[in-house]
Structures are given as structure tokens and as C-alpha cells.
Amino acid sequence: MKKTKVVCVGEALIDRIRNKSNEGFTDFLGGAPANVACALSKLKIDSTFIGRLGSDDYGKKFITQFNKLDVNLDFLQVNNDSSTRVVNVDRDKFGDRFFSGFELSLIHI
């Protein structure tokens, strides 16, 4: 039987989620492609992540997590001149999520 291999391309970013008390935030490793690569690896499916991280502490945390889960990083780019993207996640009065922090995203392209 052939082993399944999946390539996940896109963002790895920090989800900065507002605490329920509305006082402060908690940071989580996020970004759908990064999350999928990690989840597949936990399911024993070979996964590769292709994306770009900053060389900051958040970027290092991603690399540590990817390595811990044996996600292939052969095509990962690490940018020494920028930081890993952080996105703020808030909830409106109905509990729906909304995101901010993409305003400067073109700087990272």
C-alpha cells in the first residue's frame, strides 16, 4: 500500500485571541495550512509545510512544533528581516469571530 503524502501551502501565523474577560490575549500557533500539516502528521500521514516565517521567537516555536510532529520543512522560508505574522481574533456580541492585523500584510510579500 502506498503511503499518503500531503503538501500544505500557505500561512503559519499567531492567532492572538482575546480572553473572555476582555482583559488581555492568549497567543496560539495558527494558520489553516500549518494546522492541517500538524494534524495530518498526528494521524501518521506524511505532510510537508510550504510557507514563510519570521526568524523571531514565534517562528522558532513553529519550527519546534513542526519538528516535534515530523512535518517536512524542506521548502520552508525563514525571513530574517521580518517577524511572524500575528492576527488578532475578537468576538462580536453574537460570538462570531472577526480578525484584524492583516493591514500591513503586503509588506511581507
Q: What is the role of each PLM region?
A:
Residues 1-19:
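Positively charged, low-complexity intrinsically disordered leader regions
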Residues 20-21, 41:
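Residue-level detector of alpha-helical segments with a strong bias toward transmembrane helices
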Residues 21-30:
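Short pre-catalytic strand/loop immediately N-terminal to key active-site residues, enriched for Gly-Thr
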Residues 29-36, 58:
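Conserved donor sugar-nucleotide recognition element shared by glycan-biosynthetic enzymes
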Residues 35-46:
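Alpha-helix C-terminal capping segments
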Residues 46-107:
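Conserved N-terminal subdomain of the carbohydrate kinase-like
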